[in-house]
UniProtKB/Swiss-Prot annotation:
This is Large ribosomal subunit protein bL9. The gene is rplI. Keywords: Ribonucleoprotein, Ribosomal protein, RNA-binding, rRNA-binding. GO terms for cellular component: ribonucleoprotein complex; ribosome. Belongs to the bacterial ribosomal protein bL9 family. The keyword Ribosomal protein applies.
Amino acid sequence: MKVVLQKDVLNLGDAGDVKEVADGYARNFLIPRRLAVRANDGNTKAAIHQKRLAELKRDKRVKVMKELSASIDGKTYEIKVKVGENDKLFGSVTANDIALAIKNTGVELDKRKLDLGEPIKSVGEFKIKVRLAEGVVPGIIVKVVGQA
């Protein structure tokens, strides 16, 4: 049976793809869970059109993110924090703190795009990846400076 996928399905395809699947798989799993609909001329053409629109939108977003990437790639952002003995921070530097430091330079960036791993808990320089879009991952340097 031919179906048009409504959502991404693991090991099958992405939303908008037209796939040939077993009748039972379509009737008992895909269609009841609204992951797919039975393919006919109307919804097949609509799915192809929607997929084209989504690709254009994604390409536009990637282009904008590449421009943003060029403006922040390799730059150093300094964050001043209070420290105690042995340059140990009171608290930690989080993705939100880094996003605010970047925002202060005039670049709007969502904190969820920062690949921090875990919060920074010491003074020094740290390389951080910014995941802007698929294939667009600039690196920034965060310099954590202690103040008494």
